[in-house]
Design a protein with these regions (language model features):
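Zn2+-dependent metallopeptidase catalytic domains
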Residues: 26-31
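Catalytic cores of eukaryotic secretory-pathway lumenal/extracellular enzymes that build
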Residues: 4, 22-25, 41-133
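Mature N-terminal segment immediately following signal peptide/propeptide cleavage
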Residues: 1-23
Length: 133
């Protein structure tokens, strides 16, 4: 088992911004009417926010305040949070996400579950866990 820290450097973030900026949205038949597909104006607003408005560094710092680890299981690297409970002998609580999701679903409730010994894995192929070969 190894300690883990989320560490996206500025170079990685710039590449992400470039990829987001290069996204070409399909033409839609009826803007604002979601019955015919996603509203491309909404998607463009979302892409702009991810490039220029979202504070990726702040989110990284928020997540790194909690202990994270990786371990190797049958050749697959599994990423997980292990947040010890506030009391010795706290009841363990395993929080697992589904598809298509990630541990981020639970990050907001970590502080609310401090009475429990939390284990929150990233399923194989999600977030920082690798896919089986």
């Amino acid at each position: 088992m190894k300690e883990f820290c989320i560490d996206f450097g500025e170079e990685q973030m710039e590449k992400l911004r470039q990829r987001i900026g290069c996204t070409r949205l399909p033409r839609t038949l009826n803007e604002g009417n979601w019955s015919l597909g996603t509203d491309s104006n909404y998607l463009q607003t979302l892409l702009d926010y991810w490039c220029d408005g979202y504070d990726w560094s702040r989110k990284q710092r928020e997540l790194n305040q909690y202990p994270q680890f990786t371990c190797e299981l049958d050749g697959v690297t599994i990423h997980f949070f292990h947040i010890p409970g506030s009391n010795k002998g706290a009841m363990p609580l395993l929080l697992t996400h589904g598809w298509p999701d990630s541990f981020l679903r639970y990050a907001k409730v970590f502080p609310l579950l401090s009475d429990y010994d939390l284990v929150v894995p990233s399923l194989p192929g999600f977030a920082f866990s690798t896919l089986p070969s």
